Amino acid sequence: QMFHVPIEKIAKGNPEYSLRQKGKVATLALGYQGGTAALIAMGALNMGLAEEELPDIVQRWRSANPRIRDLWYAVEQAALTTMQTAQPQGIYGLIFRYEGDLVYGQSFLTVQLPSGRKLFYPKPFLQENQFGKMAIHYYTVGQQTRKWEVASTYGGKMTENIVQAIARDCLAETLKSIDRMGLQVVFHVHDEVIIDAPVSITVDEICDLMAEPIPWAPGLILKGAGFESDYYMKD
């Protein structure tokens, strides 16, 4: 899509195969509004891409994925409008609210997910960011300092928070279904579920379970894949 080349031409032996690496690193780095810096952080220069190529790759990826790009801006605008008006904003099954706790004097920007669960951004306020653009700021615990500090966010970053949270909620539905079958979930890692099951339980049964529709996500296509092993390992 990015390079207007049929997918079957991107095969070893074809000159178009050189586009594969560009597309791969772009997909990894640009899905949540990343730019040239994100490409470099993902190792684009070490993969043989020239720095002067990167802005074009960013623009090509965004042009090839307009719905993803538009989602970043819709999320950002909903969050900003919520903060500016203190009125709830609803988009794509999400509800943005500015909420307060009168007992403890706390305030939050919240995003209600399709599952009903909420994301919380503590003590939010509007302020220009380092690019001179009005942006949402909030308090968070710094990864390095482990202390409360102010962070700014933007549409792509909030989209990442939302997408990963929804993915977690989908996995949680599967965990509940597995539990209802009487099977033991030993642990789970990101999008993987490790089950200690009798030999009579097949991988296909579990994969079918993971593909079952979720009531709060009608139309969402789900698919599972798995394997059997005597101990945990990567596929």
Where are these regions (language model features)?
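Conserved catalytic core of nucleotide polymerization and phosphodiester-bond processing enzymes
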Residues: 1-235
